């Protein structure tokens, strides 16, 4: 049976493409590798930032996105324990190979002035949590057992 072998990219809506690219490039070290007009979407912009392991983090901005309100508990969870509507993203977790890299990411993120919680040991993984621009709840995790 053929099935996917992983995630190529996840696309997050943004009202401020420049701010998001700067955050993920500077804070997480993910370089911008492509930015282009969205095919068949007038005024739409699609950007790709590369992560280790052959996957990408993607940002999408449409002309009306900046005017769409962020509503915690509906459009965004706001925290790792927060609620949001069915079909929305509760949080985005990035992967690192081990606890040493997790601690290095925590320290790097903190040097950028971002508050980081953790690491927390969940048994199957260890994680740190922090907030990105536009109320995105972010996590970096490594194997725990």
Q: What are these regions, as identified by a protein language model?
A:
Residues 66-95:
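Helix-adjacent hinge/juxtasegments
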């Amino acid at each position: 049976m053929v099935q996917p072998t992983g995630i190529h990219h996840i696309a997050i809506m943004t009202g401020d493409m420049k701010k998001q690219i700067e955050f993920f490039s500077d804070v997480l070290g993910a370089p911008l590798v492509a930015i282009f007009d969205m095919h068949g979407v007038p005024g739409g912009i699609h950007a790709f930032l590369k992560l280790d392991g052959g996957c990408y983090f993607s940002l999408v901005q449409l002309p009306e996105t900046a005017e769409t309100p962020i509503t915690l508990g509906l459009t965004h969870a706001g925290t790792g324990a927060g609620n949001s509507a069915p079909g929305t993203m509760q949080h985005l977790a990035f992967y690192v190979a081990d606890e040493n890299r997790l601690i290095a990411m925590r320290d790097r993120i903190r040097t950028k002035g971002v508050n980081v919680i953790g690491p927390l040991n969940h048994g199957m993984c260890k994680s740190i949590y922090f907030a990105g621009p536009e109320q995105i709840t972010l996590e970096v995790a490594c194997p725990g057992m």
